[in-house]
C-alpha cells in the first residue's frame, strides 16, 4: 500500500535524480530500506558542492538504532552535451560513539539512455567493521521530456564483508520533478529508496 501511494505521488510532482547533493539552498528527504537497514535521512545543501545532514538508522542486522551526522562533498563534475559524470566523497559519525563512523566514495555517469554508478563505503562499528561495495547499471526504455515521468530498468550488484558474496538483482527507478523512487527485490526482501527534494 505504501509503495502504491509513493508511485501515485510521482505523477503529480513537477528532472531530478538520486544525487546526494541538491541545488544551492535545497533540501532533500530520503527513505531507504533493505534486508540489513532502514534509514530516514534529511540533508541541506548550502551550495551545489556539498551537503550536511542527519540520518536515523534502524540496523536490523546488528539490532540497534542510532543517529548519524553526515556530510557529502562533490570532488568532480564533468558535463558534456550528451552526458554528465559526478564523483563524491562522503562521511558520517554516529550518536552512539565517536568510534562508530563511516566514510566512502561514490560516483555516477549518465546519458539520457544509460546510467552507471558505483559506491564503496567503509563502516566502523563497536561490534564489527565492514565494507559495502555496490555497482548499478541501467537503461531508459524511452527518452522523456523535462516534465515527463522517467523510468530506468536497472541491475544492481552488492557485496559486503559480512555476507562476503556478490548479489545481483533487478530494480526499477522512476522519477518526475523532485520525486524519485527505486524498487527492487532480492531473496524475498524489498529494496526501496524514496527521495523528495524541496
Regions found by a protein language model. Name each.
Residues 19-158, 167, 171-198:
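Transmembrane beta-barrel domains of bacterial outer-membrane proteins
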Residues 164:
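Short, glycine/acidic-rich beta->alpha junctions
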Residues 1-21:
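Cleavable N-terminal export/targeting peptides
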